[in-house]
From Swiss-Prot:
Its main location: cytoplasm. It comes from Danio rerio (Zebrafish). The gene is bbof1. Residues 22-34 have a biased composition (Basic and acidic residues). The keyword Coiled coil applies. This is Basal body-orientation factor 1. Disulfide bonds: none annotated.
Length: 520
């Protein structure tokens, strides 16, 4: 029993020491956490101080930007006022030139209508006379063509007759020669066939007799080997007999073909005789027709001579009357030439006016194209610099030296609240001009482009809506524009004659609305 108690006491002492060590560890952890919280609090306090300082700096920058914006709006107002004066002067000049051109064009139209009316009267009078002469000439030429056609028919009949006679003679000669040749070839073929048949029969008889004698002698001399030689000789004789039989059949076929050819030649001969009879009858009828046509030709030649004499007399009379009318026509031509000279002078004046207007338009177009190129280059440079700055700030924030900037996009996202494209679009607005004196060089390229587009619109009489704060533009030493202060009235519906009078959709590089001007 006492041993067990001693063991129990030893265990109790061990447990008490473990609890004390745990309390010391928890107190050390709590102190370390307190130190961390203090360090974090000091860090956040430093961040708050830095943020407050940056907020104050941003506020000062915003005030400076607002002041600069107000100055730019004032500059814009002055620029618009100067531009309106320029446009009013150009419009007055353009209106005067347009009125002069319209008056000259109206006079030109009257002169053209008068000359065209006089010309139409002369043309109608002469056309009536020409139509009468042409009708008479058509009648006479129709009669003459009919006579020529009948003469050609007679000549054609004569040629046909000579050709038919020559063909008939050649056919007769050919038929005679073909008949003679056919008879001779038929006789030769029959003779050859008869002689060949006799020769073959004689050769066969001789061969048979020779073979019979030879077989008899050989049968007597060599009765043992006689059977084999007789068989071979018999085979050879049979082959020779077959050959002669085939040759005889071929000669029979040749005889049949020659007989058919002879019958066809006989039929051809009969046909040629019938054709000869028909040709003779046709030639006789042609002889009678030729005699009739010859008599008719003589009468037509006499009538043609009479008609040609009458036509010559009428032609002489028409030439005499045309000579009288030519004097009147020359006087009208001289008057028309004088009118044309006057019209050419008017055209030259109008052309010079148009050239002056075109030079002004080309100057505006070149300036607008230059502004658009500069806008494109400036926007590209701004995007690159903004992206570079944004990446640098992100790298600094990752390193812990700066705060993380706002998320910024560079791809013109539709739902983005901080995109570079919106800043580029804001540079096109006019609300940053507040000063009373603004130089053209102080404007952005976007504002210069908008100003040039507005000049195009004002030059062509396009009305623009009013702006709430119209700025003014002051000319610099290098870009001064001086015009009279009184503004001319806008033209409601100008004619689409010049380059600058195209629609604004074809002239502007972006779809934004032009800024409005306040009427002075």
């Amino acid at each position: 029993m006492p041993k067990k108690k001693g063991k129990g006491k030893g265990k109790g002492k061990g447990k008490g020491k473990g609890k004390k060590d745990g309390k010391h560890d928890s107190k050390a952890d709590r102190e370390s956490e307190i130190e961390k919280l203090k360090s974090n609090a000091s860090l956040w306090e430093a961040k708050f101080t830095v943020t407050d300082i940056s907020r104050l700096e941003y506020r000062e920058a915003a005030r400076a930007l607002a002041k600069a914006n107000e100055e730019l709006e004032n500059q814009q107002y002055r620029a618009e006022k100067d531009t309106k004066d320029i446009i009013a002067f150009l419009k007055r000049t353009d209106f005067e030139k347009t009125a002069t051109i319209a008056a000259l064009e109206e006079e030109l139209k009257r002169e053209r209508a008068k000359s065209a009316q006089e010309k139409d009267l002369l043309v109608a009078e002469y056309m009536q006379k020409i139509d009468a002469l042409e009708e008479m000439f058509r009648q006479r030429s129709g009669d003459f063509q009919r006579m020529q056609g009948e003469l050609k028919t007679i000549k054609h009949y004569r040629k046909i007759k000579a050709n038919l006679e020559e063909d008939l003679i050649s056919i007769r000669e050919k038929m005679y020669v073909d008949g003679r040749a056919h008879q001779e070839s038929l006789a030769r073929t029959e003779y050859k066939f008869y002689m060949a048949r006799i020769r073959i029969e004689k050769e066969a008889e001789q061969k048979i007799s020779q073979l019979a004698e030879q077989a008899h002698y050989e049968a007597v001399d060599q009765l043992g080997a006689a059977s084999q030689t007789v068989i071979t000789e018999n085979i050879r004789l049979n082959e020779g007999l077959d050959y002669h039989v085939k040759e005889a059949e071929q000669l029979k076929r040749i005889n049949v073909a020659l007989t058919e050819k002879n019958s066809s030649l006989a039929l051809f001969k009969e046909t040629n005789e019938l054709m000869k009879k028909e040709a003779d009858s046709h030639v006789q009828s042609q002889h009678s027709e030729i005699s009739e046509l010859t008599a008719k030709l003589s009468t037509l030649e006499q009538a043609l001579g009479i008609m040609s004499r009458e036509f010559e007399q009428e032609r002489v009379e028409m030439e005499r009357s045309a000579g009288v009318n030519n004097t009147e026509l020359e006087e009208l031509e001289m008057l028309l030439a004088a009118r044309e000279k006057e019209l050419s002078k008017v055209k030259q004046l109008a052309q010079s006016i148009i050239e002056q207007r075109r030079e002004l338009e080309l100057f505006f177009h070149e300036a607008l194209n230059h502004a658009r190129k500069e806008i494109k280059a400036q926007q590209q440079h701004y995007r690159q610099e903004a992206l570079k700055s944004y990446r640098w700030r992100m790298n600094e924030a990752h390193a812990g030296r700066l705060e993380f900037p706002r998320i910024r996009t560079f791809s013109n996202a539709p739902n983005s609240t901080n995109d570079v494209q919106t800043e580029l679009e804001d540079s096109d607005k006019w609300n940053n001009l507040r000063s009373s004196n603004v130089d053209i060089s102080d404007l952005t390229w976007e504002q210069k482009e908008r100003l040039l587009n507005l000049l195009f619109a004002k030059l062509n009489g396009i009305k623009t809506r009013k702006a709430a704060h119209p700025p003014a533009l002051s000319a610099s030493s290098s870009e001064k524009i001086q015009v009279s202060s009184d503004a001319g009235s806008t033209v409601e519906s100008p004619s689409m004659t010049f380059i600058t009078q195209m629609t604004m959709a074809n002239m502007t590089s972006d779809p934004f609305v032009l800024p409005a001007l306040k009427s002075t």
